[in-house]
UniProtKB/Swiss-Prot annotation:
Domains (record comment): Consists of three domains: the N-terminal catalytic domain, the editing domain and the C-terminal anticodon-binding domain.
Localization of this protein: Cytoplasm
Phylogenetic classification of the source organism: Bacteria, Pseudomonadati, Campylobacterota, Epsilonproteobacteria, Campylobacterales
Record-stated family: Belongs to the class-II aminoacyl-tRNA synthetase family. ProS type 1 subfamily.
Gene (UniProt): proS
NCBIfam families from the UniProt entry: PRK09194.1, proS_fam_II
PANTHER family: MITOCHONDRIAL RIBOSOME PROTEIN L39/PROLYL-TRNA LIGASE FAMILY MEMBER, PROLINE--TRNA LIGASE
Gene Ontology biological process terms, A to Z: prolyl-tRNA aminoacylation
HAMAP family named in the record: Pro_tRNA_synth_type1
Protein name: Proline--tRNA ligase
Reactions listed under catalytic activity: tRNA(Pro) + L-proline + ATP = L-prolyl-tRNA(Pro) + AMP + diphosphate
Keyword NAD included in the entry's annotation: no
Amino acid sequence: MRFTKFYAPSLKEAPKDASLPSHIFLTRAGFIEQIGSGLYNFLPLGKRVLDKIKNIVKEEMDKAGAQEVNLSFITPASLWQESGRYNVFGKELLRFKDRKENEFVLGPTHEEAMLSLVKNKITSYKQLPLHLYQIGLKFRDEARPRFGLLRCREFLMKDGYSFHANEEDLGCEFELMYKTYSQILQRMGLDFRAVEADSGAIGGSGSKEFMVLAKNGEDDILICENCDYAANVEAAKRAKKTCQDERPEANYASKFHTPNIKTIDSLAQFFKINAFYTIKAVVKKAIYENESKLVVFFIRGSDDLQEIKAQNACSALELVDASEEELEKAGLVAGFIGFVGLKDIDFYIDFELENEKQMIMGANEKDYHLIGIDVVNLNKDRFKDLIEVKEGDCCAKCGAKLKQSKGIEVGHIFKLGQKYSKAMNANFLDENGKSQPFYMGCYGIGVSRLLAVAIEASHDEKGCIWNKTLAPFVLEIIVSNLKDEKALEFANKLYEDLTNLGLEVLLDDRNERFGVKMNDFELMGFPYALVIGKGLENNEIELIQREGLVKELIKTDELMEILKKKVL
């Protein structure tokens, strides 16, 4: 492609709302253009990268035996109501009516639509397993779209759904998709981890996220460097903590006057103990479909509450902070809340506290705490995983220290089980002739998001740094002076030869200053550039590698051999 014929408008300034490198550089370099809040056009450069990502995804999915379909972007609301997700999904689900008052949604995911596609058509276990996928647009009405393609409202996604006769077969497909997604990301040259994850509004049991490691990542992940354990902080587990400091001793539930001791730090100082031996109460207002109520979560004083875990524990749609007025109305005394004698309030206790002895917690009375508390003889259903695992905690799998890192989610695979098929009455006949709901799996990968993630993971202060797999052009030929007829002739001949070899080459034949051309090369980030200038008089041209901006003078008679080694 000749630059004079190619549409790639670059900008000197970054968008005012751009803070991340991918947003800044992809916009400035002419890969994408914002047309509204969270809405982006893909220009030719961006479309070339997008197509490469799509092709890799498609090749690997097809290789795994999945079949491609293309579902409507719009889904009847009745399908979402049937599955029970219509209200659960919240305001991110864009709902609208047509002129006949029929209700529809713009699909952020397509579980319901895909299940509807096979319902009453796949009727026997002999037709299973089946895996269908699509690569298409999704819409999620984000409250605060930001970070360019990383959190936008309209996005391109590959979503696949598998149908099985039993849980064992679903497990096999889950493992196959784990390997397939790993292969997709490896082919793209991305440093990633597959981590344990929360299933969110999609639901299901088994869940793994694929995280690309990047310092600007919005997700915290915990990685064990001794074994293969890795998890999103929302789902991370640890080996149970211990403490060697002296434990307080007292008769069971002794009441102790603690004037104005409202915080864990002040409580630990007051009793001259480690906060490990205290119990912290965190009060939240749980939002449900038709009601809201206060819920108390009890965790060790030295720990912090993980809100997604807490939300899952009480099956709420959302958790928000409770006001002082709400606490007073419920009869709760801020700073002095405990589970002994707590009435008419739902509460949960972190499972690490089960069977702990000689603990200290609030007495549900102003300026009083209970000491000598044994966490025993409580309903097992009250014990949940509630705490936030942190760097330095020990791996639940091998006991080694966990390290915290930043990552960006690019893919998510779920074992949905029978959640959707039961809700939508989608059944098949098993080998005994008995009607059974399908076992389902769900597998998503953010195609347009990967474009931004690649740059978050690979850039410098000058611009993008693409690898050869994803780059819109692998090589740019830059003629430093268009008035140099010999250089221009050499460049044109080289361009034709390399193009005929199947190499994706951009010939910068613009009548611009050399500095402008170099700035654009550094901004757009193609893996290599050949600069043809005065050195041609000595049969030399300059090869520049974008990563590190490494420069090398090459003799013209050695050029093709070197390009075949490094570029082709």
